[in-house]
């Protein structure tokens, strides 16, 4: 028996009984039985040849905590009625710059019908780790906390529409906990390209919000022409959402080649993208597409 494998198995047994990491190391008896069986030349068990030993007692086994540390997920993916519950085209949530345990995305939530709502997971799979309504804690400080309902185990809304969904992941013991904020779906045109030409998040810079899951968010008209350019100091079209207690640029994004490109944990998004006076930005967050025209 591989010693590391046995130590891991024993640790899992004690954790399942309610013990926590700080209670290790410990000394405990271990009871083992050995099994022998004849096999064919191809490794197949020969029926009727199995034999099991008496119980072997190891009276004092010194056991260190032998499970790997639990970490917050590096990625989160969203599925739901908006994409027919397909992991193949799941939305990847965006990490807040400098806060790799916090993710966000604009998402359309509904609450009616057996397939309503959304779930999220750190893998693109139905593997038992997906989080629905019962696996999240709704942040009471959310703009729209009262709208969120249990939609057949999924995360749904009593008022179908768009939400800025922010998931904060923390480790408690051996479990990952999800504190989820559901804010207004505010998307801002930002910076020099706006009519005001400033960096404050003001109502005049808000995108309009569509009524459907496949609709487009539309910006106000660009008020100042921006030339774009290869460096971060060049003026360009910039867009963001606002994450509580974070600077605006920590949740910014832009449109490249008709696709939404998120900054995430990256640096300045270059090259900057040009925009002419009167043009608007059109964004589809279900398809992750965009256009400036």
Feature map (PLM): residue ranges:
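Insoluble glucan recognition modules
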Residues: 1-293
